[in-house]
Amino acid sequence: MIDDTLLEAEEKMEKATNVARENFAAIRTGRANPALFSKITVEYYGTPTPLNQLASFTVADARLIVIHPYDKGSLRAIEKAIRDSDLGVNPTDDGSVIRVAIPPLTEERRRDYIKMARHEAEEARVAIRNIRRHAKDALDKLQKDGEVGEDDVRRAEKELDELTHKYVAHIDEMLKHKEAELLEV
């Protein structure tokens, strides 16, 4: 029972870390990265559809992404969705592909993105701590119900604290890399 609680907590912490990783990837750094488009949805025949289901992406160079729509009829809708997004890029199409030049970031924009990254990291840390709290409550309930002894619960809580520290440190490391990437000119 204790092992199940710890395993469930670790799985949830891993998921929270993965969500943070995806959110960090979606923050623009001034370099061409297809993950920038992961949160964009396109009105495709009246249905909001994720862009990555409508096209493939090629990174032509450090500041250029070429988008190849699977259906040429979706070209205008994809271009409009990118233009309307908050990425601050200007897509151009040549009738068969869309080219997106990634402009260099201004110092002010870099600071905004760093704030955004720190906010994402804090949300992930809070999620991990909440998972820890729920797992600790479950362990306390097991002890209260008399299913496990106090020593076992203390050992499990120590393990839970180590897990929490490990995942929070991982989030901090990802944030450090993202900040370095954003500050790189």
Swiss-Prot record:
The keyword Zinc-finger does not apply. GO terms for biological process: translational termination. Transmembrane segments: none annotated. GO terms for molecular function: ribosomal large subunit binding. InterPro entries: Ribosome_recyc_fac, Ribosome_recyc_fac_dom, RRF_sf. NCBIfam families: frr. Belongs to the RRF family. This is Ribosome-recycling factor. It comes from Acidothermus cellulolyticus (strain ATCC 43068 / DSM 8971 / 11B). The gene is frr.
